[in-house]
Design a protein with these regions (language model features):
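Surface-exposed, glycine-biased beta-strand/turn segments
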Residues: 2-83, 116, 125, 154-186
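Generic beta-structure capping elements
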Residues: 41, 59, 90, 101, ...
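Solvent-exposed loop/turn segments at secondary-structure junctions
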Residues: 43-45, 63, 77-80, 91-94, ...
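Short linear sequence elements within intrinsically disordered, low-complexity coil regions
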Residues: 47, 102-103, 109, 146, ...
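Zn2+-dependent peptidoglycan hydrolase active-site motif and core
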Residues: 67-110, 133-139
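Conserved, short, structured surface segments that act as functional micro-motifs
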Residues: 86, 94, 112-172
Length: 186
């Protein structure tokens, strides 16, 4: 298989990855994160319960960005999540949860309209996060008809974020994946 054919297959994979119609299209909450750097931890047991989120490792103080255009529904200090943000999308269909923040962006308050990619906070290790492992705990919830910030159906953010990163071409394909495709094709 030629390198050109392998590149075309990668392109087709990217197009397919971006076509999941039932999931929200989101931006990365941490600029520069690549799809291959993510690890699915949704079903892992953390502190006695299912994690239902993804942890994105980043240095303390790294900007956290809104993944969609929306409204800050709730800023909340919790024992487990520390400084948290609950963002609703414009349709009120999904809630995006950002936790363990070092701090919020200046001027951010409940009811603030935010744009996709806008800085809303900074990575930290507040709540029950280890100071040795600062990260963003990121979750997605499908809201019910009541649209409560504290209640929704958890959606695994890993495949949603991975597909969005690949589809947006913000993620480079590691050379080892191309080589594996070439090897598999014989």
């Amino acid at each position: 298989m030629s390198l050109r054919l392998a590149a075309q297959q990668v392109e087709v994979s990217r197009e397919r990855a971006g076509s999941a119609a039932s999931e929200p299209a989101i931006a990365s909450p941490i600029q520069g994160v690549k799809a291959y750097q993510l690890r699915d931890s949704f079903n892992e047991i953390h502190h006695g319960h299912r994690h239902e989120a993804i942890d994105i490792m980043a240095p303390t103080g790294t900007p956290v960005r809104a993944v969609v255009d929306g409204t800050i529904q709730k800023l909340f200090l919790s024992k487990a999540g520390g400084n948290t943000i609950y963002e609703f999308d414009d349709e009120g269909e999904y809630c995006y949860y950002y936790a363990h923040l070092e701090r919020y962006a200046d001027g951010l308050h409940e009811g603030t309209r935010v744009s996709r990619g806008e800085v809303i906070g900074y990575v930290g290790s507040t709540g029950d996060a280890s100071p040795a492992a600062p990260h963003l705990h990121f979750a997605i919830y499908l809201l019910g008809p009541q649209r409560h910030w504290w209640r929704g159906t958890a959606i695994d953010p890993y495949p949603v974020l991975e597909r969005s990163l690949i589809a947006s071409r913000s993620s480079s394909v590691p050379i080892y994946l191309i080589l594996e495709m070439l090897h598999a094709a014989g």
